[in-house]
């Protein structure tokens, strides 16, 4: 394990500045005294776009590549046309750094309300393929603006891309107590891509005899996520289905305000990026109202990815305890929550 962490910090837009500041405080408190934390802040997002017209240049990628990991606050602002920052920054970074595993833990934490009846046991992880499917930009339009307009959006699925994300999901399932893995797709209709996913899922599964597996159509999965969320342990799925069901998973486990995520390059060839699922929330930016818990839980994912398991667990335990103690109490500011969690983590 490296005894230093060289971290790229991207506060981004809106509340990103506020929540990332709290995440860094907790990160510093969690690290052992002999681990040196070095950070470099990058000004990406709406402000830079308006000033320069740039989102993410090749020189930016070269600079980011020198770091061990990336912590992102939020990217997005209503002053920028829709899709400009998403494609020009987020997707460009994902493809450039081969972040082919999008990791989304979904756990109902103490003191957090779920819209589901009762208080079901919710503790699973979605492993979403991040660099293929219909998000590769493979498509086009003709006869645009006419009654005969045609648009195509091609879903790209390769055996190489599928196998590596499926293998990652099996390894994560193997490491969890329940050792269960579900493949979610729609292979009865999307027969070409669906059968490729299914065949590779079954073949890789032969190497993981301790992992119990099942296949589930995506429409059935959305039902079971609501009616039987406790049946899930690890889910692996493609880019599009993963984009949809991870938001449903966040909704049933307390909302995106406490949802963390990681965009992972498991090989370590490029730094992985960790971020809260919530957006930039420009309507409350600068008011101290943003809850930094999702960012702080993303810091825990970052530490676990870098090999600091005990420190990651300590952060998660601190957030759980803090959430449990909030019930029935007045809302606190962003700084107050961050300060309280920093004290808990520091011990």
From Swiss-Prot:
NAD(+) binds at residues 279-291. It is found in: Cytoplasm. One of its GO terms (cellular component) is cytoplasm. The record marks 135, 186 as: Important for catalysis. SMART domains: Iso_dh (SM01329). Mg(2+) binds at residues 219, 243, 247. Its main location: cytoplasm. InterPro entries: ICDH/IPMDH, IsoCit/isopropylmalate_DH_CS, IsoPropMal-DH-like_dom, LeuB_actb. Catalyzes the oxidation of 3-carboxy-2-hydroxy-4-methylpentanoate (3-isopropylmalate) to 3-carboxy-4-methyl-2-oxopentanoate. The product decarboxylates to 4-methyl-2 oxopentanoate. Homodimer. This is 3-isopropylmalate dehydrogenase. It comes from Streptomyces avermitilis (strain ATCC 31267 / DSM 46492 / JCM 5070 / NBRC 14893 / NCIMB 12804 / NRRL 8165 / MA-4680). The gene is leuB.
